[in-house]
Each structure stands twice: as C-alpha cells, then as structure tokens.
Design a protein with these regions (language model features):
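Bacterial N-terminal signal peptides
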Residues: 16-29
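Kelch-like beta-propeller repeat domains
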Residues: 30-362
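Generic short amphipathic/hydrophobic targeting helices enriched at N-termini
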Residues: 11, 20-23, 311
Length: 362
C-alpha cells in the first residue's frame, strides 16, 4: 500500500510539474524555445542607416538612408542584393534622395513614401516629404506618383488587398509654416493612415492609428496590419521622445482598429522588421533616457494568431536604423548605425554588416 501511495504521489508531482511548465510558457511566452541561426553574408557596399528594404522576385532592394561621418546630404542609394551570388549591385539612384522612407512591394514593384529630404545643400535634411515613387527593378526605372495627403517621415507601409497603407510617422502641426523637423521646431508624431491604390494612383484617408508614433515596425498577416513599437512624441531619440511597446491591429476590410495586442517584450524604435510564416520579426533598435543610451541586439517575433511573443538568438552586432527584408526563410538585417542618435563630423558610426537569421521552426 505504501509503495502504491508513493507511486501515485510521484505521478501527481510529475503531472503538476508538467502543468506548471506549460503555465510558465503561457505566462511568459518570451521564454518559449525557438530555433534558428545567424549567417554572415556579403557586406553592404556603402554603410548607411535609416534605410528601407524590400524583396522583389527573390532579390532584396535597399533604398535611401544617411551616410557616415556626420554628413548631412542623403545619398539616395539604391542597391540590389542577389542571394544566389551573394553579391550587391548598385542601381539607379532615387530621383529625390531621402531617409526614413516607408516602403512596400506590390506586384513586382517597390513603392516608397515620404521621408526626410534636403532642399538645398547645407540645409537640414529633415524636411518632411509627401513624395511617392514607384521603382521598377526589372527596368531599373523610377516613376513619380500622386503625393501623399500628409507630409511625413519615419512612417511605415504594408500592402493588403491591392492597396498600400502608409501609417504613422512624424511631421509638422496643421497649418504650420513649412520647415525642417528639429528638436527646437514644434512638430508631432502622427497616427495618419492613408491608403494608396496603385491601380488608380489615388489616395484615401482611413481611420487614424490610436497611438500616434514614428520609427515603428509593421507587418501584414492574414489580411490584417500590425503596427509594433516605435517612438512617441518627437522623432528625435532622447528629450521628449520615448519608446513604446504598444502593438495595434488594423483591419482594412472594416476600416477599424482593434483592441490592444500583447505588448512587445522590449520597447524600442528604429528596428528592422520582416514577416515570415505568420510571424512578424523585429531586431535591433535604439533607446535613450536620462541615464543612458544604446542600441539593441534582441531578435523577437510576434505571432498574431496566438497573440504571443517569442525570443530568438540575438543578432551578432547591435545596431539601429537597419535595412531589412525576407527571402525564403532568411530574415536579412543590413547595415545600420552602431550607436543611438547622431554623431559629430568625422565620426563613422554606420556599419556594413549584413546578417541573415535562418528560420528553422516554421
């Protein structure tokens, strides 16, 4: 009898331990195991940050950004990456060089929106723009599109159902005289949500995002759009700006925003992001507060179906303002800046590193 009681007790303990382990995973999804590894690929030829990336027909295209060394003129870079050859090729530059651009692919072309521009040499490079462009990789050609209703930079874009939604960003207050954004110039984060229709070259204003922000991440999964993290108040890290961990869901079919989703494990802005297998992957980013400033190595993925986050192996080199894109099961993280915020003349804080996370658990 005592032996049977002992066996029953041990069985109950085993069951309880299993249940407890499952409960811990549910309560702390960031601790759930995940598979994958980082691989090193051909470095980016001209290190830059605040660049935009997109995938078209199995190749990556990187646009815009800011150079190293405290230079203020955006170079308007365009590069194509061929994963088969592990090689970068320079393409026709942007007609109007910009940084902090929102980009999305649709039917073999890349659509780019807004960003910060420089009107004259020596001036600020942070005039918010309403320009929209179509880049055709097959022809290596550019076409100007109908301008956005709202001038802004540091917005994000995603395509659902043949329309491209440009959401958030930073810009001037309504009615303000045209000026460059700066910490001393009154400006604001935006919840603007504007849908571009490539078929008709027209815009439609949609329901604004509840949490106005800039420098966020975005992903489209199962017909819905998710905006993750970013920066509230100012687009300039530090000062009045602060990172947010808020995740919001937009349904283009109903034109409405849903209830708040599971918050990010790490509040951050200026991240790289990409979507694969029903998950949205976020890497890197930056933060500042009164005590310190820095950049992140963290790689985390959000699963909208489960409304859960998972933690994955960190990128080898911490950085922010990267270009990012997905080809097959590889999440590419390209160039970026090694520190938070700006640098002085002659200081090179951008890096040419090109890493890809090989996803093996989806």
């Amino acid at each position: 009898m005592r032996a049977e009681l002992k066996r029953c007790s041990e069985a109950r303990l085993a069951v309880n331990a299993t249940a407890l382990a499952a409960l811990i995973v549910l309560m702390f999804p960031g601790n759930a195991p995940a598979q994958g590894k980082w691989v090193k690929l051909a470095p980016f030829p001209e290190p830059a940050f605040e660049i935009a990336g997109a995938t078209v027909n199995g190749k990556i295209y990187v646009f815009g950004g800011l150079p190293s060394g405290g230079q203020t003129t955006p170079p308007g870079l365009v590069y194509e990456y061929d994963p088969g050859a592990n090689q970068w090729t320079k393409k026709k530059p942007m007609p109007l060089p910009a940084h902090h651009i929102a980009a999305a692919e649709y039917r073999g072309k890349v659509y780019l929106f807004g960003g910060g521009i420089q009107k004259q040499a020596g001036e600020s490079n942070w005039f918010p723009s309403d320009h929209a462009w179509e880049y055709d990789p097959a022809a290596d050609s550019w076409k100007a599109l109908a301008p956005m209703p709202t001038k802004r930079g540091a917005a994000v874009a995603a395509e659902v159902g043949g329309k491209i939604y440009v959401i958030g960003g930073a810009g001037l207050h309504p009615g303000a005289k045209e000026a460059a954004l700066s910490p001393s110039q009154p400006h604001r984060s935006l919840g603007a949500n504007e849908a571009y229709d490539p078929a008709t070259n027209t815009w439609q204003t949609r329901s604004p995002m509840p949490t106005a922000r800039n420098h966020a991440a975005i992903g489209a999964v199962n017909g819905k759009i998710y905006v993750l993290g970013g920066r509230v108040a100012s687009p300039f890290i530090g000062g009045d700006a602060s990172n947010t961990d808020v995740v919001e869901e937009y349904d283009p079919a109903t034109g409405s925003w849903g209830a708040l989703r599971a918050r990010m494990l790490t509040a951050r802005s200026g991240v790289g992001f990409g979507t694969y297998g029903g998950r949205i992957y976020l890497v890197g980013g930056e933060f500042q507060n009164r005590a310190m400033a820095g950049v992140f190595r963290d790689l985390e993925a959000y699963d909208p179906a489960a409304n859960q986050w998972i933690t994955l192996p960190s990128v080898p080199l911490a950085r922010q303002g990267v270009g990012s894109a997905v080809i097959g099961n590889r999440f590419h993280v390209i160039s970026g800046r090694l520190q938070s915020g700006g640098v002085g003349p002659g200081q090179a804080a951008n890096y040419d590193s090109h890493d890809a996370f090989e996803i093996t658990d989806k």
